[in-house]
Structures are given as C-alpha cells and as structure tokens.
Amino acid sequence: MILEDTADFLAALPSMRSLMGLDLGTQTIGVAVSDTFLSVATPLETVKRRKFTLDAARLSDIVAQRRLGGLVLGLPRNMDGSEGPRCQSTRAFARNLDKSIGSDLPITFWDERLSTVAAERALLEADTSRKRRAEVIDHVAAAYILQGALDRIRVIRAEQDQE
C-alpha cells in the first residue's frame, strides 16, 4: 500500500519492524535498512538492475529475510521541487513492487535531492578510494534517504507524544 504522507505511513507500520530504504537508479538499486526502533539507517547492498521481476524478487527476499515493516523509496524531484520523468518512473516502480510483493507492506517516498552528493561527500571525507566509492555509493545514498525519513518519523512521534 502506497502512502504519500509520512504520518499516514507511520500509522500503518507494524511495531518493532525495520524499514528498507531504496535509491533507484537506472543500473542499480541502493538498499539500506533501519534498526527496529527506527532510529538509525545502515547501508546494506547494491542490487544490479536486470528485469523488474528479478529486481522485485531480490527486494522481496530482503523484506522476508529481515521481516521488514515498510519501504521508503527515494523520489528524485527536480531542484525546483517539481516532478519529472524520473519521479514518474519511481512511482511506477513502487506501484509494480506493491503488486509484486502482494502484501500490505506500507510504501512511502522521501525527497532524495542531493542524497548522492551527500553520500559522495561523506565517502570522500572518510578517505574512501575511488574504486570503493563506486562500489558503495548507491547503498550509502539509500541510507541517507532512509535516515531522512527516520528523522521525520522521530519528529512525528515526538509531536504525538506531546498531544
């Protein structure tokens, strides 16, 4: 089930389940996971894109193995905030993945503008070699996307606790 609003997404999440963050590219999918308390995102792996059915099967395996409670997909908005063809492609991927997984797994989107730039900068600061950066950039970017969503979830929970 695809939910646009983060608060609705949070309400639909099962308790004590981790989330998976995805950074969709044309050739790869960066994958990151959170802890069960939804506080920290960790890069997991980069999936080499082939056919959708194979990609969906791999992501479905990760969801099942880790008993994940929801998915956060990076939404590649234009710098002015508008949605272009890449956003449409991401939304189509989410719809197809939702059908493919065939469960009531909540799916939401998170603005991924500059996530790859931030990931690249962090890897440069960590003095990572060019070869290693190329290997890990996608799942590190997925962790940045997921961490942004987790930070928003923390704010929503704090606001709910004050009410």
UniProtKB/Swiss-Prot annotation:
UniProt xrefs under SMART domains: YqgFc (SM00732)
Disulfide pattern: none
Any GO BP: rRNA 5'-end processing
Lineage top rank: taxon: Bacteria
Transmembrane segments: none
Keyword Lipoprotein: no
Keywords linked to the UniProt accession: Cytoplasm, Hydrolase, Nuclease, Ribosome biogenesis
Coiled coil: none
GO cellular component assignments: cytosol
EC number: 3.1.-.-
Pfam families: RuvX
GO molecular function, one term: nuclease activity
Enzyme class: hydrolase
Family per record: Belongs to the YqgF nuclease family.
Record's protein name: Putative pre-16S rRNA nuclease
Naturally occurring in which organism (per UniProt): Roseobacter denitrificans (strain ATCC 33942 / OCh 114)
